[in-house]
Amino acid sequence: MARYIGPKCKLSRREGTDLFLKGRGRSLDTKCKLDKAPGQHGDRRARLSDYGLQLREKQKLRRIYGVLERQFRNYYKTASRMKGSTGENLLQLLERRLDNVVYRMGFGATRAEARQLVSHKAIQVNGQAVNIASYQVQPSDVVAVREKAKKQVRIQDSLTLAEQFGFPEWVEVDTKKMEGVFKSIPERSELPAEINESLVVELYSK
């Protein structure tokens, strides 16, 4: 199954919230009516059942991190076998994806752009090039832009903007060297509050 490459607004309208797929500081314009679902009858957004709410939350989480269904289900299975809260484990596994860490460190303006940088071998981990977007970054790992890619204007622009917005507590970034340290796995309290991972757990627990 191919990745969705259509309008970002359509995905956000489907979920009824801005998924921030357009990058830092670029919220959806006013033409994107988040209170209406896409399609001819979008103004008649149906009241969802419990199952519908669970499904929508799963789709929202998948789309935020850009993960396909089979891979997302595998993340859930892994999370359910780990100690602690399955929902928190799931979010932490998604946050530890290399493409997400590249995005969090500001090397990519969006997760999609970060994924492209990884696949094009523009990123290295602990001095070694890694081109697998799903690679699980470990605490203390050093993630950096490879020397040959440091002149890319899009990376420079993204870093400048990210520095203005600030970096998450669990990463430490040296913008001049274009490298960062993944200091620790983020706690649930440090992650977006608008995600209700318990609905995803309920969905897959059936």
Swiss-Prot record:
GO terms for molecular function: rRNA binding; structural constituent of ribosome. Part of the 30S ribosomal subunit. Contacts protein S5. The interaction surface between S4 and S5 is involved in control of translational fidelity. This is Small ribosomal subunit protein uS4. The lineage of its organism: Bacteria, Pseudomonadati, Pseudomonadota, Gammaproteobacteria, Chromatiales. Belongs to the universal ribosomal protein uS4 family. InterPro entries: Ribosomal_uS4 (IPR022801), Ribosomal_uS4_bac-type (IPR005709), Ribosomal_uS4_CS (IPR018079), Ribosomal_uS4_N (IPR001912), S4_RNA-bd (IPR002942), S4_RNA-bd_sf (IPR036986). GO terms for biological process: ribosomal small subunit biogenesis; translation. It comes from Thioalkalivibrio sulfidiphilus (strain HL-EbGR7). It comes from the Bacteria. It holds the Pfam family S4. Keywords: Ribonucleoprotein, Ribosomal protein, RNA-binding, rRNA-binding. SMART domains: Ribosomal_S4, S4. One of the primary rRNA binding proteins, it binds directly to 16S rRNA where it nucleates assembly of the body of the 30S subunit. GO terms for cellular component: small ribosomal subunit.
